[in-house]
Amino acid sequence: MRLTIYHTNDIHSHLHEYERIKAYMAEHRPRLNHPSLYVDLGDHVDLSAPITEATLGKKNVALLNEAKCDVATIGNNEGMTISHEALNHLYDEAKFIVTCSNVIDESGHLPNNIVSSYIKDIDGVKILFVAATAPFTPFYRALNWIVTDPLESIKEEIELQRGKFDVLIVLSHCGIFFDETLCQELPEIDVIFGSHTHHYFEHGEINNGVLMAAAGKYGNYLGEVNLTFEAHKVVHKTAKIIPLETLPEVETSFEEEGKTLMSNSVIQHPVVLKRSMNHITEAAYLLAQSVCEYTHAQCAIINAGLLVKDIVKDEVTEYDIHQMLPHPINMVRVRLSGVKLKEIIAKSNKQEYMYEHAQGLGFRGNIFGGYILYNLGYIHSTGRYYLNGEEIEDDKEYVLGTIDMYTFGRYFPTLKELPKEYLMPEFLRDIFKEKLLEY
């Protein structure tokens, strides 16, 4: 018997591209003279797309239904960018199996409509699908989820199903380095479908006998794995990717649909808020002030590139605010000494990333822009640092409000190790909208 498995990962609500992939599968799957499956590896949802924001991911699930998805798992965007309740209802209308072994609530229950593993019987061959997602522990904790060690959860689930399956497939939203470890730890795995780190393999990769397959990001590729079975075991396995550029174009209206769904008015009077990458504008000041107030901090730091578009309108809608601040970025409250706060101010004053093309960590803009400091100051001639007009004391504890993308080590390594509290699920646009109501 032969089985073809199509796979996508990290679509991130690039729904026009996904529609092309969906059309390709709709045309080609019926032509196969053997069984086929389609699996998605998570991060299909991304709230930077208006239609995804407006439907809290339900549109993405509807598209997966239309694509005749068979099995899917969750990525950090499904798990961490919507509320606890929203994840519990995300898959209410799903016509496919959603599996993830390492996210539970405080009572030990999986999210609604999600199973810890799944066995699919195809012509007598029993295929076990086990999945896990990346363990961003503090973020899940802030949303009242518990994320467990993915390696241990996968091992435990395999042992629970031992004797019930012929073929073992892992759906991993944990990244390529985790997948490589998994190959060494569990060589009995037949295929690992990978994601999260946006990697891809043109023809798959065999690692310790395990076939690794991955299809990049944003729908740039559709993955295809072909398995041949004899006596209920895999005897041959190959992988390839199909570039998006080789697929026919289609017409879509996702942006217009999202705009319509977010057309409700927020402010009914003229607003002029412009952005700049290299100096403080009123919009940047208001955003920094919003972060400081929302985090109940004494000061705040943001970057100007967070403001992606101007708002110059006689009336402001939800869509306008989303376009200005499309990022799935949360706020964070950091406690730190005066010494550490001075280090952060000094580093921000260097403006190392002002004109850098930034990507990842939730950032959905283009240019990073200059740092905007709120309630913080530095007098170069005296070498003194100030908070709200008072000199910062080395041994005193302060509270800084900022954004989660600064806490991963890329921009401010100091922040990675400091005690912090992530404030979720509100995004920058949510707190900025509240500030604009005072405008």
Q: Whereabouts are the PLM-identified features?
A:
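Acidic, metal/ion-coordinating pockets
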Residues: 1-243, 280-285
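Flexible, glycine/charged-enriched surface loops at secondary-structure junctions
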Residues: 168-171, 268, 298-304, 356-360
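Catalytic centers of hydrolytic enzymes
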Residues: 220-262, 266, 270-274, 307-330, ...
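A structured phosphate/pyrophosphate-recognition subdomain
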Residues: 277-279, 297
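C-terminal, charge/polar-rich interaction regions
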Residues: 285-286, 296, 304-307, 314-315
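Short helix-capping/linker segments at secondary-structure and domain boundaries
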Residues: 296-298, 439
